[in-house]
Swiss-Prot record:
Known role: Terpene cyclase that catalyzes the cyclization of farnesyl diphosphate (FPP) to delta(6)-protoilludene. In presence of Ca(2+), a significant switch from 1,11 to a dual 1,11/1,10 cyclization occurs, producing beta-elemene as the major product, with lower levels of delta(6)-protoilludene and (E)-beta-caryophyllene, and traces of beta-selinene and alpha-selinene.
Binding-site list for Mg(2+) 2: D89
Motif, D(D/E)XX(D/E) motif: chain positions: 89-93
Positions of Mg(2+) 3 binding: N225, S229, E233
InterPro entries per the UniProt record, alphabetical: Isoprenoid_synthase_dom_sf, Terpene_cyclase-like_2
Site (Plays a critical role in the stabilization of intermediate cation): F86
Entry's free-text remark on domains: The 2 conserved active-site motifs D(D/E)XX(D/E) and NSE are required for coordinating the divalent metal ions that stabilize the PPi moiety of the substrate.
Motif range (NSE motif): 225-233
Disulfide-linked positions: none
Residues binding (2E,6E)-farnesyl diphosphate, per UniProt: R315, Y316
Source organism of the structure: Stereum hirsutum (strain FP-91666) (White-rot fungus)
Family listed: Belongs to the terpene synthase family.
Protein name: Delta(6)-protoilludene synthase STEHIDRAFT_25180
Length: 351
């Protein structure tokens, strides 16, 4: 398929046309969204204009699509986590590497000390993190708590590296980009939420097949998210950390060529995931096998959830997301660097 018909218009491929996990949303979505959104807004992290744009992104929808089978309490954990992610994301996007290093240190200190008051003059992300984790650990096993903190430290350090790349205008190649993107996307701590009520031992989660399935789902999430976010990111001059720009630079191709490359790469990942899911899962006995099945299905569902949210929220396509999901053609936005901390408003553009 030709994915660009002019320099100003391009086609967004549907990489999940045959993905077997359908859209599924948690029945507690509206109720938990109300509570988590009010909690996130209570910190005053953004100015009114940016807060309005942030709310339109509906990160609670992402959590409700990603955790459709979780209880109301654990869905609240997922919603709070998504909101916490994107507070850090929006601040780090416009901060110097030095400031992002400090933000990451504050977050990790708050995770390790959820009952200790934060300094009054500290960056707001510290208190957001502390409150999130203090509530989350009430419904998480000890193993899940440990894994979450380990995964979140890797995530924060990758965001620091991303800030350094941005500061130096450094464009990675595909392999090194995906290696870092697997961390910056936040999938690893997000996957731990799937385990919070499970008793899976470390040796199960460290098994090569489980690790491969986790990596494959993460890569598909990365590619899908980068496809959706590319237009907004290139418009605000923040597209160096995006697979479309990476592929264009490495292979000397245009947007059409980059989209074609991503489609083919995504298809390989999809085939590998489905083969392992259908043929490669070991058995750990009648007590653990149902948990493993639920966890791996959660990985597959996360791929669908991320893609659906990209179109159903207003983060990347404004109010036109559902229309674009159907027609797939979009106009390339004109470059305009965002001035405010917070998601870029896109409804005024001719998407």
């Amino acid at each position: 398929m030709t994915v660009v018909d002019s320099p100003q218009r391009f086609y967004i491929p549907n990489c999940l046309e045959y993905w077997p996990w359908p859209r599924h949303i948690n029945p507690h979505y509206q109720e938990v969204k109300k509570a988590s959104a009010a909690w996130a807004e209570s910190f005053g992290a953004f100015n009114p204009k940016a807060q309005h744009a942030y709310n339109a992104c509906d990160f609670n929808l992402l959590a409700s699509l990603a955790y459709p089978l979780e209880s109301e309490e654990r869905l609240r954990t997922g919603c709070d986590l998504m909101n916490m992610f994107f507070v850090f994301d929006e601040y780090s996007d416009v901060s110097s590497p030095k400031d992002v290093i400090q933000q990451a240190a504050i977050i990790m200190d708050a995770l390790r000390n959820p009952y200790a008051p934060r300094p009054d003059d500290e960056w707001v992300g510290g208190e957001v993190t502390r409150q999130f984790w203090k509530r989350a650990i009430k419904t998480a096993t000890a193993g899940a708590q440990r894994r979450f903190i380990d995964a979140f430290e890797s995530y924060t350090q990758s965001v620091v590296q991303q800030a350094k790349d941005r500061h130096h205008g450094f464009i990675r190649d595909v392999d090194s980009y995906l290696e870092m993107r697997r961390e910056t996307i936040g999938a690893k701590p997000s996957f731990v939420v799937l385990q919070m009520d499970m008793t899976l031992p470390d040796e199960v989660l460290a098994h090569p097949v489980i690790q491969q399935l986790s990596a494959l789902s993460t890569d598909m999430i990365c590619l899908g998210n980068d496809i959706c976010s590319y237009n907004v990111e290139q418009a605000r001059g923040d597209d160096l950390h995006n697979i479309i720009t990476i592929a264009m630079n490495q292979f000397d191709i245009d947007i059409a060529g980059a989209m074609d490359w991503v489609v083919k790469y995504h298809a390989k990942l999809e085939r590998k995931f489905l083969y392992l899911y259908n043929n490669g899962l070991p058995s750990w006995g009648k007590e653990l096998d149902p948990q493993v099945e639920r966890y791996v299905c959660g990985l597959g569902n996360w791929v669908r959830a991320s893609d659906q949210w990209g179109f159903e929220s207003e983060r990347y396509f404004g109010k036109k997301g559902k229309e674009i999901f159907k027609r797939r053609w979009v106009n390339l936005m004109q470059p305009e660097r965002a001035q405010d901390i917070g998601p870029t408003l896109v409804d005024g553009t001719r998407l």
